[in-house]
Regions:
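Structural motif
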Residues: 5, 73-74, 112
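A short helix->loop->beta-strand "cap" motif at the edges of active sites that frequently abuts
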Residues: 108-112, 144-145
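Conserved glycine-rich Rossmann-like NAD(P)H-binding loop of the short-chain dehydrogenase/reductase
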Residues: 28-38
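Conserved beta-strand segments of alpha/beta enzyme cores
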Residues: 29, 51-53, 146-148
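N-terminal Rossmann NAD(P)H-binding glycine-rich loop of SDR-like oxidoreductase domains
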Residues: 4-29
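Oxidoreductase cofactor-interface core, primarily capturing Rossmann-like NAD(P)-dependent enzymes
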Residues: 2, 19, 123-201
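NAD(P)H-binding glycine-rich loop region in Rossmannoid oxidoreductase-like domains
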Residues: 37-38, 42, 46-100, 104-108, ...
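SDR active-site strand-loop-helix element
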Residues: 9, 33, 78-79, 113-119, ...
Length: 201
């Protein structure tokens, strides 16, 4: 029996590689849709031979999105940037890219699309990052109303770029300042159950 295919845009990123491993363990065939397939070569051993494939794709290019998505059972879009560079602008990645993925998913009749946005996504925000994340949500909802949109806060786990920075700082300082904050959700990758969602603050 053929494995169901799940395409993961941004599969070589921090969240992506944990998700790819989890999906492969569940028995799915995984297409890790990435701009640099060589940088995603480490994903292949996460499954049986041929189960995990690094697939060349750019969310800004509609044709490459369609090629990556065709035949998929489900699609997950994790693509996002924290700061723009060259042709990778917030608008092109968070809005145009998100719209391209959702448009193709709807056109091909794929029933399941999960889109990763961000906590604080808002058109009223002073941050262009948050503004474009909100614009991307609208584009996804308009193109594919059945899509599931997630708004995670801090995502942490092995090799993350958040808590591990603080861990490295403890090597140079006995104390670290801790700033109070409201309660907010967090997502932890790894552990006994793979992914957990909780609240902290």
């Amino acid at each position: 029996m053929a494995r169901k295919i799940i395409t993961v845009f941004g599969g070589s990123g921090f969240i992506g590689r944990h998700l790819v491993r989890r999906l492969a363990a569940k028995g799915y065939a995984v297409r890790a849709a990435v701009r640099d397939v060589e940088a995603a070569a480490h994903l292949k051993p996460m499954g049986d031979a041929g189960q995990v494939v690094a697939w060349p794709a750019d969310v800004k290019n509609l044709a490459s999105v369609r090629a990556a998505v065709e035949g998929s059972y489900a699609v997950i879009n994790l693509v996002g940037i924290l700061s723009p560079w060259s042709k990778q602008t917030f608008d092109r990645v968070h809005v145009d890219g998100a719209k391209n993925v959702a448009t193709v998913v709807a056109a091909l009749g794929i029933k399941r699309l999960i889109h990763m946005s961000a906590l604080g996504a808002s058109l009223e925000s002073e941050s262009r990052y948050a503004q474009t994340k909100a614009m991307g949500e609208t584009a996804v909802s308009d193109a594919c109303p059945s899509a599931t949109i997630m708004r995670p806060s801090v995502v942490f786990g092995p090799e993350d770029r958040f808590f591990n920075i603080f861990a490295s700082l403890t090597r140079f300082s006995v104390t670290l300042p801790v700033i109070g904050a409201p309660i907010m959700p967090k997502i932890e990758l790894g552990g006994e159950h793979g992914i957990s969602i909780d609240f902290f603050g």
